[in-house]
Amino acid sequence: MGHFLRGNLHGSRGYHVPPVSKLFDLPGALASLNADFWQQALSLTDVYEYMPNDRRNEWNNQIHEMKAPDFEENAVRATLTELLFSRQKFFSERVDGIFRSLSRSHVTNRPEGFSKRMILEYMFDQWGTCNYDRTGYVDDLRKVIAKFMGRDATGLNTTNKILKIARDRSGEWITIDGGALRVKAFQKGTIHLEIHPDMAWRLNDILAFLHPAAIPAEHRQKPRTKAKTFELHTNLLPFSVLSVLGDLQTERTEPEQRNRREEPRPPVTTNPYNRRFKGYSDENPAARAEAEKVLLSLGGVKMNINAFTWFEFDYDPATALEDIQLSGALPELKTHQFYPTTGELAAQLLDEADIREGETCLEPSAGMGGLADLMPKAQTTCVEISPLHCRVLEAKGHNVIEADFLAWAPVTDQRFDVVVMNPPFSEGRAVAHLNAAADLVKNGGRLAAILPAGSDRKNLLPGWDCSWSAPMEGMFAGTGVCVVRLMAYKPD
């Protein structure tokens, strides 16, 4: 019955309902049935993952308009076989389609191939909604670049979410996919794209395969000089994990009454800063397990009632989660030396620092606020190198400066009554950070720090009045680091 109605009402849009006799015309029902079967058949294979945007649009239009071929065995076998064996060919078609989609009205787009900056038009409609026929080209570009980077593009379905974030941040360059792409969206519906030079020449190399005489040789060679404005990262989260994170939902925090006869059902949480996974846990358990680690690393606390689980935060995680969607990665622990201060250790250090009302304070390696959360926000300046961690700190209400502390300290004219810090330890950075922080302490001020064990045997701050705690083990999960607490007073 549904196919009779869908097939014979299609196109009427409610303005004209055909006679009842027409509702049961067989051709309309068969057209609806054909479209439904073709949709299911294509979804059962991975050809949609490989199809370039133009082919996807063509198939989607045939199915939507119910003009798909008859769903007969010979036709289905022949069509699916051809599509499956064309997957390699689709790769070059995808690159060609991306190039042809570039705006011809902007001189930034060069006719001889892909350049560093490109412009695509009509990506959003007048209401700011993604134009899916056009955003598919950006999706194709991301999948091609993913292949260049050795990433599995299966599950890459976050492009429209990313473009929506870009539009919400109109006029701002945002970096995506580990630095492979930069995107700037505009309210009029246009986006500007910047491609990493290592990716642009590879795209041109494929384009030259299709159009040998059109692409000059210099555009098909790897750049000899390293790009100064691009930093390419390769330790990226799988797209399947990013997809799970992109689908996170917020659990209701108010009682719900489904009907008048039923008592209101209380919410499982009253914390508005909560997130839960969409769907069932067995859909992609590996991706969900990795996504769970991401939420925990952002400070989420896993809660449950029987089998139902969700995560609660003490800040709004929306912007931090958006940044992960964009960059495709978490900050590297090794690079940023991010080992968050435990509650016990932070409380001990802040108790010794004894911050008083009106004193100006500095946390020079703030991370996600392990120490700063215990310091008076109105009196405290946080410095943090990781953009993602800065988003978390801002969401918590901290005053944040996004900078490398060792680069910021020599140029700032700010001085502080109290510095509280847990600096990175590797490659002598603890001492470098300590010395830089000491220069920012006012005369008569004080500094409280967590440092590697053994630091107490060195005269790190000559002329200061220093006291040290006993060595402490097991204070940072997953490490064998032994630490000491330093309390140092600068002479007047």
Where are these regions (language model features)?
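Class I S-adenosyl-L-methionine-dependent methyltransferase catalytic core
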Residues: 1-492
